[in-house]
Each structure stands twice: as C-alpha cells, then as structure tokens.
C-alpha cells in the first residue's frame, strides 16, 4: 500500500511560527502565510509572482490562476484566508479556506468532509453495538435463538468491590455517642447482668434479691428462755454492799 502524502490530507495538521505572532496583523498576515515551511501555501500561486516582481496585491485582479486573499480579519486573534482560482477580473472559484487563531494556521473542512466524518462516526457506533449484541446471541436447532449473558454476570461477580476508606471519628462524635448510650441505658436498663467475666449472665431481679439482707428468724423457745432470764435478773435485788475493814 502506497504511503499517503501529507499534502493530500491537510485537515489533520496545523502550522505555526512563533516569531511572527507579536507582529501579526492584517498587513502582514499574507506574508506570514507565504512562509516556505507552511504546508498550506502553494508556491505556484500568483501571490508568489507578485512578490518576486515587487508589485502590489491589486495586480492579482488582472492575472489568471491560483491566488490567496484575506477574506476576514478580527485582530489580533482571528484571520481567514481564502484560496481561489481566478478566471477573469470578475469571476473566481473558491478552492479552500484557512483560518488563523492565535498564530496557528488550520485548514477549514469542506462540507463533504464534515458529512463524511459524521457518517463514519455514526456507522462506527452502530457497528460496535451490533458486534456487542451478536456476541451474546446463541442458536440451537432445537431451541432456536436466545441471549446468553451468563459470562458477563460471572465477570461482574468476580470483580472485587472497592472498599470504602474508614475515616476516624472526632472527639465530639465519640462524646456524643457515649452520652446517647448512657441516656438509653437509663431509660431501658438491661435485663441480664454479667457479674464476673466468663460467667453466665444473671437476671437483674435475681441480683437484687441476693443483695437484700435476709432477716434472722428466732424460734419461739429461744424467745421464752430470754424472757425467763430477764425476769430472774429483775427479781434479784441489788447486790449487798460489804463493809469495809478499817
């Protein structure tokens, strides 16, 4: 397959000479466009003949052939240059348009190129959709046609899910949570309590019963003996006083 010349496809390239950008204006833009390194410029044009003979651009109207003119200028950003075929002083045929934005030269696409690009983009998208659909289509003489998406579902299951990064809580959040838990504990006390680590939880009612002191039960016989002892003690008189020896 023969290599494609760069001049046959000028829509995908641009050209710029940074040394001209500060002095670029309506009077110098055609000289800037006629630089030798510019791939958009045709050396066989009438502008080159006028330049070599040191004539003004007004002589282009009296010549026949390819020429470049300044079609529109919006200094200092935008300039539009047209390439045209002059057949007579009053008859010209436009061939191509070039626009210069901030010193960079581009070729403006023609209507056929724009339509061709849009159609190719649409056809490529439709073709990709049909290829993707056909990859899931299955056929069997006994079953007919059906869609098979099992492989796609298995691939989704195999893909690891991205883990969310856990951010540490602030001091205010921890204090707030502790206060809420304490409030809930007071409103709804626990029904089971674990007295010691490792032991089974015990109901709260049982722990309260164990904590209360058990009253001592006194037998009636013991009560009667204590009463008799108290009566004998009270019946006896006070102890006699012994006389002291002088």
Swiss-Prot record:
The keyword Transcription regulation applies. InterPro entries: Mediator_Med6 (IPR007018), Mediator_Med6_met/pln (IPR016820), Mediator_Med6_sf (IPR038566). The keyword NADP does not apply. Keywords: Acetylation, Activator, Isopeptide bond, Nucleus, Transcription, Transcription regulation, Ubl conjugation. There is a cross-link at residue 208 (Glycyl lysine isopeptide (Lys-Gly) (interchain with G-Cter in SUMO2)). Transmembrane segments: none annotated. Its main location: nucleus. The modification N6-acetyllysine is found at residues 236, 241. Belongs to the Mediator complex subunit 6 family. Component of the Mediator complex, which is composed of MED1, MED4, MED6, MED7, MED8, MED9, MED10, MED11, MED12, MED13, MED13L, MED14, MED15, MED16, MED17, MED18, MED19, MED20, MED21, MED22, MED23, MED24, MED25, MED26, MED27, MED29, MED30, MED31, CCNC, CDK8 and CDC2L6/CDK11. The MED12, MED13, CCNC and CDK8 subunits form a distinct module termed the CDK8 module. Mediator containing the CDK8 module is less active than Mediator lacking this module in supporting transcriptional activation. This is Mediator of RNA polymerase II transcription subunit 6. It comes from Homo sapiens (Human). The lineage of its organism: Eukaryota, Metazoa, Chordata, Craniata, Vertebrata. The gene is MED6.
């Amino acid at each position: 397959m023969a290599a494609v010349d760069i001049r046959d496809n000028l829509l995908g390239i641009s050209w710029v000479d940074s040394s001209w950008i500060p002095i670029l204006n309506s009077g110098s833009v055609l000289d800037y466009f006629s630089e030798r390194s510019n791939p958009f410029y045709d050396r066989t044009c009438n502008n080159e003949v006028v330049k070599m003979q040191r004539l003004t651009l007004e002589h282009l109207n009296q010549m026949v052939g390819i020429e470049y003119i300044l079609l529109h200028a919006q200094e200092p950003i935008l300039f539009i240059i047209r390439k045209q075929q002059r057949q007579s002083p009053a008859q010209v045929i436009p061939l191509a348009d070039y626009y210069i934005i901030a010193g960079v030269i581009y070729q403006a696409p023609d209507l056929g190129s724009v339509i061709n690009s849009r159609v190719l983009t649409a056809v490529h998208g439709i073709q990709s959709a049909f290829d993707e659909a056909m990859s899931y289509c299955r056929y069997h003489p006994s079953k007919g046609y059906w869609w098979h998406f099992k492989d796609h579902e298995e691939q989704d299951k195999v893909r690891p899910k991205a883990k969310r990064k856990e951010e540490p809580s602030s001091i205010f959040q921890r204090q707030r949570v502790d206060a809420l838990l304490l409030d809930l504990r007071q409103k709804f006390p626990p029904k089971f309590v674990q007295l010691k680590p490792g032991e089974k939880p015990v109901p709260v009612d049982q722990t309260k019963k164990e904590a209360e002191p058990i009253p001592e039960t006194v037998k009636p016989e013991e009560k009667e003996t204590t009463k008799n002892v108290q009566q004998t003690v009270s019946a006896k008189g006070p102890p006699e006083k012994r006389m002291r020896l002088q």
